[in-house]
Amino acid sequence: MDNKLDGLELLRFLAALAVVTYHIPSIGIGHFGVDIFFVISGFVMMLSTSNNTSQFLLKRVIRIAPLYWLTTLGVFGIALLAPSVLKSTDASIIDLTKSLFFIPFDKNGAGHQPVLAVGWTLNYEMYFYALFALSCLLCSRFRGVLAVSFIVVNIFIQGNFDNFVSQTYANLIVLEFGLGVALYLMLKKDIFQMLAVLSLIGIGALFNFEEGHRFFLFGLPSLFLVLIAISYSNRLPNLSLIPLLGGSSYALYLCHTFIIRVFDRLVDWFSNENSLLEVSAVLISLLGSIGVSILLFKYLENPILIYLRQKLINKTH
């Protein structure tokens, strides 16, 4: 399987862009981008550990945590210094600590409410990273089957408790990582393991079928979108822009709400029910979010990643 999957990079960017459109008030469509992310994540975890599983968890923490921590601290700073700017975020040290350590919590009955609102998905990411890392340690050959087994067993266990953390990990959305694992095994023609993973996913889905509408409506279609993206990778033009967009998708996902809020304020000040200006503001919000995310990736996120990898991975590997 070709490790240069430009189709996957492009889909990653489009998934982030879909989440951006979901948070633009006048559009409000695109939350399925998160489901695409989760399927991609399961696939990439299998692909990235196909030859070497060592230091997997460290590598993923280095990739995910720095920018998330910076943006979370930024939001906390705003909540502390200018609380009127934010609607539902308090300058709570307890909330900050839970957010930085990827611990799910319920804020005033509003569901997932980390300091950086979009960070709820990263709680799921880190959860699966931990299970996958454990699976790599136990048996790297069957790491995918083991990881999905842990997820399904935990769905059964956590589903018996009413607390928010348990209900978070019993949510069928976690099975979307398993879809990515199954896709990798299918493309590797490992039919036995693929069928094992799909059987486990089916068992997990049946346990909480009535609450699993998101998994069925968006998770399964996301699987086919990821398959299409991988299949067409070699047919895409060899453009440096595609890896750049894919690389900046994480910054786009984390930071877009700030940019949208700025342009929303501008529209409120100047629009006077001017529909043309409102349409322009939507386009500017999209383009502005993309532009800022590319700058953040090139001049902040990527330099930090390179530095941490050199200091923490290359020296110990």
Where are these regions (language model features)?
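A short, conserved beta-to-alpha structural element at the edge of catalytic cores
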Residues: I93-S99, N108, S149-F164, I173-F177, ...
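Short alpha-helix carrying the canonical HExxH Zn2+-binding catalytic motif
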Residues: L10-L11, G119, N123-Y124, C255
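Alpha-helical transmembrane segments in multi-pass integral membrane proteins
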Residues: M1-L8, L14-I29, M46-Q55, F105-G111, ...
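Membrane-interface helix-loop-helix regions
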Residues: I40, L58, I64-M126, A130, ...
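Juxtamembrane transmembrane-helix termini
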Residues: F32-S88, S233, I259, F263-D264, ...
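Structural signature of hydrophobic alpha-helical transmembrane segments
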Residues: F32-D35, V118, Y169-L172
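Hydrophobic alpha-helical transmembrane segments of polytopic
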Residues: L8-A15, V34, I40, Y68-T71, ...
